[in-house]
């Protein structure tokens, strides 16, 4: 007979790497064309003026300018880039 108890197995011990999602450039910040504005899963925020959307729903600036968050209706948020700050 064994004198030591066999160690039991566990079904835990896994975790996925974080995906670094979220807002990368905030309202009023200056951006250049191609800068990533938001990394997201699904369209929590929709692209507005001068903002493109990648296949993974990443929003990025199409022109140099300033970031502005807006509400297109009661619920939906959009992000736009304008060449002037006002």
Curated annotation (Swiss-Prot):
- List locations, semicolon-separated: Plastid, Chloroplast
Q: Which InterPro entries match?
A: Ribosomal_bL27, Ribosomal_bL27_CS
Top-rank taxon: Eukaryota
**Short name of any one Pfam family annotated for the protein:** Ribosomal_L27
What does the UniProt keyword field contain?
Chloroplast, Plastid, Ribonucleoprotein, Ribosomal protein
Q: Name one GO molecular function term.
A: structural constituent of ribosome
Q: Name one GO biological process term.
A: translation
Q: Per the record, GO CC terms?
A: chloroplast; cytosolic large ribosomal subunit
Q: Where is this region: Disordered?
A: 1-27
What family is it from?
Belongs to the bacterial ribosomal protein bL27 family.
Name of protein: Large ribosomal subunit protein bL27c
Please give the organism: Porphyra purpurea (Red seaweed)
